[in-house]
A protein has these predicted regions:
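Class I S-adenosyl-L-methionine-dependent methyltransferase catalytic core
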Residues: 1-251
């Protein structure tokens, strides 16, 4: 009888509230190859900045299954390579992504059958929505196809102003109670610390959103910190091996 019971237990469908990724406030990201996007990444030879894309499966899955599970329409102003759209599609959620990079649009279509719109989120018609899932460009850390992206801004404050403009346009079309999931990172370059996470929080507060949850996105297990450790010790700061997913709610 125990064997029969075990067999039945083994074939039972997963409950509706089953989560593939454990919902904890620190999520360790597994290795991700970049074939078809930028080739393989060797973290022994490159800075940790190279690991900022593609978007982590664990985070996309958590947002789709947990934070945005009740959203009727989720938008994405920086749709990227298609990972977020793929997660929403797995959960049968309506998703509309916009991106300026023809390369990213093509990759999303071919690899994930996610059909994002080639458009500039600074000017595109934004639909009414109750969810947003995105990861903005990290200013000039990576250069994308196309000449008009935010990565082409020559000054940090110009980038922040353009980023603010995009979020403001989308927030103006967000329904009351809308959920916004935004992943950001901080970094150093030429002795300057760039605090994109904090700047995002300031923008969202101004737009009438409040924090709902935060998840530390840890890349410690896949980052080879030894290449950056000597400089960090010498200059007295930490090696950045994490990003932050911040979940906001519109009042």
């Amino acid at each position: 009888m125990n064997d029969t019971f075990d067999f039945i237990e083994g074939v039972k469908p997963k409950p509706k509230d089953h989560l593939e990724i454990l919902p904890v406030s620190v999520m360790e990201i597994g290795p991700m190859g970049k074939q078809g996007v930028r080739g393989d990444t060797d973290h022994n030879k490159q800075s940790s900045r190279s690991g900022y894309s593609p978007f982590p499966y664990e985070i996309a899955e958590t947002c789709a299954a947990l934070f945005l599970r009740d959203a009727k329409l989720t938008v994405d102003p920086f749709a990227g390579w298609g990972e977020r759209g793929d997660a929403m599609k797995r959960h049968n959620k309506e998703y509309r992504g916009f991106d300026l990079s023809p390369e990213a649009i093509e990759n999303a279509s071919k690899k994930y059958e996610v059909h994002n719109t080639l458009a500039d989120s600074r000017t595109v018609d934004v639909p009414s929505h109750d969810g947003l899932l995105t990861c903005p460009p990290y200013w000039s850390l990576e250069k994308y196809a196309g000449d008009n992206g935010l990565d082409r801004c020559k000054e940090w404050e110009t980038f922040i102003s353009e980023y603010d403009h995009v979020l403001s346009r989308f927030a103006s079309m967000a329904e009351s109670g809308a959920t916004y999931c935004i992943m950001t990172g901080d970094w150093r370059d030429d002795g300057t610390y760039y605090d994109l996470t904090f700047r995002t929080e300031l923008i969202m507060h101004k737009l009438g959103f409040i924090p709902f949850d935060k998840v530390v996105v840890s890349r410690l297990g896949i980052s080879k910190v030894k290449i950056m450790l000597p400089q960090a010790k010498r200059l007295g700061y930490t090696v950045k091996v994490h990003e932050m997913l911040t979940v906001f709610k519109k009042l």
